């Protein structure tokens, strides 16, 4: 394993640990999820480019599309919760009746 893969894997692990530690606020959780998606995107792109996988060349783009959809949905939930309750606590997600 090269140093680049180890650094990207550590970035993924740190984002995952941040998701576990800072799970009370929705904004912190969304930022940690974006960090995880970014490190996965970079790792998949480097893997496809170094191993010359022609069939898997679209998978990083598909992952980026899913990350954009996840970010849009998360931000819309954040706006709805902050307008309704005034805070961005994750525990308010259980109270939504939509």
Curated annotation (Swiss-Prot):
Catalytic activity: a ubiquinone + NADH + 5 H(+)(in) = a ubiquinol + NAD(+) + 4 H(+)(out)
Localisation: Mitochondrion inner membrane
Pfam families hit by this protein: Oxidored_q2
Highest taxon, organism lineage: Eukaryota
Gene3D superfamilies: 1.10.287.3510
Primary site of residence: mitochondrion
A GO-annotated cellular component: mitochondrial inner membrane
Function noted in UniProt: Core subunit of the mitochondrial membrane respiratory chain NADH dehydrogenase (Complex I) which catalyzes electron transfer from NADH through the respiratory chain, using ubiquinone as an electron acceptor. Part of the enzyme membrane arm which is embedded in the lipid bilayer and involved in proton translocation.
The name this protein goes by in its record: NADH-ubiquinone oxidoreductase chain 4L
Lineage of source species: Eukaryota, Metazoa, Chordata, Craniata, Vertebrata
